[in-house]
Amino acid sequence: MDKNQLGVQYMQEGKWEEAAKIFNEIIEENPNDPIAYINFGNVLSAVGDDEKALKFYQKAIELDENTAAAYYSAGTIYFSLDQFDKAKNMFEQAMKKGLHTSDNYFMLGLTLVQLDQGKFALPYLQRSVELNEEDAEARFQYGLCLAQLELIDEAIVQFEKCIELDEEHTDAMYNLGVSYAFKEKADKALEMFDKVLEIQPDHLLAGHAKKLIESAK
């Protein structure tokens, strides 16, 4: 096992200090290795030092402007800091450099949603789901985007698939209930709101929606 692999293994085990030590050694031995800078940045990000992590990602990009993973990692930090324009730029750069993963499509789609560009987000969220059909959260966000664009029938399909993958995804259940209500299927909507409240009794939106439908009956 080479040092990079060992460092990644330490990260997977949550041994951040050991991982940082290994990646620091790699950088000292080979200061032109962009992968080591990305990995060190990932350690810093994991322990909450986003500002320093960004510097390591920028260094990796300086060493090799085609290091797609550095753009992606920087994008995730900008997203978490609500700097969505910068995040969008980073995810787009990662894509241009060849990072066509479900995660990158998902994060770019999510970023565009935050920028109120749902119509542009839709194909990226769709591609994310196509690349990883078992990702419940991607299904949910794709469904949400469809619903916001009033593509209710398509949204229902995604919410249902999300719940198949994660039987306790209350957000998907709630939004499925809202979609059914929108389609004037009150009984199906109530069934969903009841399921939400069974799992999460303090779900205020589901409780309110249930009362609204019951009072309209």
Located regions from the model:
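Helix-start (N-cap) detector for alpha-helical repeat units in TPR-like alpha-solenoids
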Residues: 34-35, 68-69, 101-103, 136-137, ...
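Terminal, low-structured helical/coil segments at or just beyond the last alpha-helical repeat
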Residues: 1-7, 185-217
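Canonical tetratricopeptide repeat
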Residues: 5, 39, 73, 107, ...
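Structural signature of tandem alpha-helical TPR/SEL1-like repeats
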Residues: 12-24, 47-59, 81-95, 114-127, ...
